[in-house]
Amino acid sequence: MSSTIIKLNAPLTQAFDFQPSSESQITPTPTLNTLTQQLAGFDTLTSALEYAAEGITGYNFYDAKGNLRSVLPYSLLRKNARNLAQRLSGFDLPRGSRVAIIADTSPEFVELFFACRYAGLVPFAMPVPVNLGSHAIYVQQLRGMLESSQASIALANVDYIGFLEEAAQEATCLKWVGTPGKLGELPEKDVELKPNHPDETAYLQFTSGSTRTPRGVVITERALMCNLQGIVCNGLEIKPDDRSASWLPFYHDMGLVGLVLAPMVTQISVDYLATRDFAIRPLQWLRLISRNRCTVAFSQPFGLKLCSLRVRESDLKELDLSCWRAAGIGAEMIRPETLRNFAEKFSSAGFDENAFLPCYGLAESTLAVTFSKIGTGCKSIQIDSKALIDKRMAVRLQADGRKQNEFVNCGRPLPGHIVKIIDEDGQQLSEMMVGSVLVQGESVMMGYYNNIEETSKALKPGNWLDTGDIGFLFEGDLYITGRRTDVIIVNGRNIRAQDIEELAEQQPEVRSREASAFGVNDEDGTTTIVLVIECRLTSVTERQSLTTRLQQLVYMAFGVNCVVELVPPHTLPRTSSGKLSRFAARQGYIQRTNLTGQLSVVESGDR
């Protein structure tokens, strides 16, 4: 980007609290642009937006009924973001100060995010509440992020400002809390906003959903632009006539990087449906793809499963999904059966199974690490379950009656990135040997913000990122077999096993270090959280009461169901240092419940 100072002198011409509009009053941004497409290649986000704003494409927001609610062309985004940046400058914050934004699927969030970058501030997206019964847990989660980031400003739409104000009561770092509308009412400061530098922090991405130890991934402009270029050029092969549709939350790395920032740096239009609206009626997402002829749309596997289960056969006749050329799949373990069921269900609506595009990534590497080859669909291999468990070897099998695990080909690393597999001693493994997945490349994070201890665990010498995942390489392609970290992914949500265990240990009947939580997957890929408790209670009534209470507490805190198993004292396995081994606890549970061969090999364990 040029070193020319950007002068912000455009008047504020509209309120920043968008009001719903009827579809007859507004039209979506077009698919075909008047601007020559440039596939990333920019130095910073703001330089990319400056270019995109010269065209006529942009973001479109739809309500639960599929009606167009708001339109935000890139030209208007630039204008509004610049004006908001001048108002943010009025706080006289040091460059690089953090700004927290509750990231609902709205134009306001996008404007605030880019306003922060124009003002030289570092935004980060905070989640919206996912479970109405977890008010206190949600506020605690927000408070943890505010304190961890030492945020100076916090913003939320009117629907969520109450949560934010409650969370901010104990956050001494904050200088101002408000809504986008209130920010828009503040006076503009007549300043020149300096352009961003590629080595500056672009944003923080919080991971794991932890309420006690949130970790903010530090992503620089350079890392972001490198990852975006790999995604749009090598992964998706974006074209001028592409259009995207998304239900993914803006606070998720796939939603933010893949479906907000990637479309902007390629100047294509996007149609959004709020995550909660998708969850209620996934048909609306498919309708957007069909009606607006969207070509690129990503989902987590559970989203495809939801479509397969919820969309009625009678609805298929109104859909034409033949336009959908890149059906990206990622963010959690990919089960081939989930993709097969989706393809079978929607083939009559024109969906081509070759559109499936499995990929692998994580926030600590900005977003994407590997992509399978576009246009080839989902490729998988059958692996001997016994060899996988006993020898950590991926031994290929034909259909001969032996127990098998089927794993999806997640493709090859993006240009400039390397993936290697190592054993417990850190030695690199050959192909078809199962071990820890490490990644090296320009997209890898600088570290976790203000968290040296967690950074040192994740980043190894040579700037190798320990992903916490387990997998193997075959003919240069990556296959993920499970997770080694203590994160359990349920319906696209990351839940820390430690948080569940600590919740259990708060009960008077449960002693410290006598609870172990992990995830197990059944044959169709559904993840279930299991909580094993060492229990001294003998009364059947008391044991049932404890089981029910723990299930209710987990649901209230995390919005998910769990299985509770009570076992005798000293049952849970421990490492040589006395720590609980979630991997061994999980294996013991599988053996006790006779589920061997029906479950994926490793879903959570010891880092």
Where are the predicted features?
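Conserved AMP-binding/adenylate-forming
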Residues: R325-A327, I334-D477, T485-V487
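Conserved C-terminal "lid"/linker of ANL adenylate-forming enzymes
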Residues: E514-G519, V530-L531, Q551-D606
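AMP-binding/adenylate-forming catalytic core of the ANL superfamily
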Residues: S290, A297, G441, M446-G447, ...
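Conserved pre-ATP/AMP-binding loop-to-beta segment of ANL
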Residues: T57, E188-F206, R212-T213, A223, ...
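Structural core segment of the AMP-binding/adenylate-forming
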Residues: S2-P11, Y118-P187, Q300-P301, L306, ...
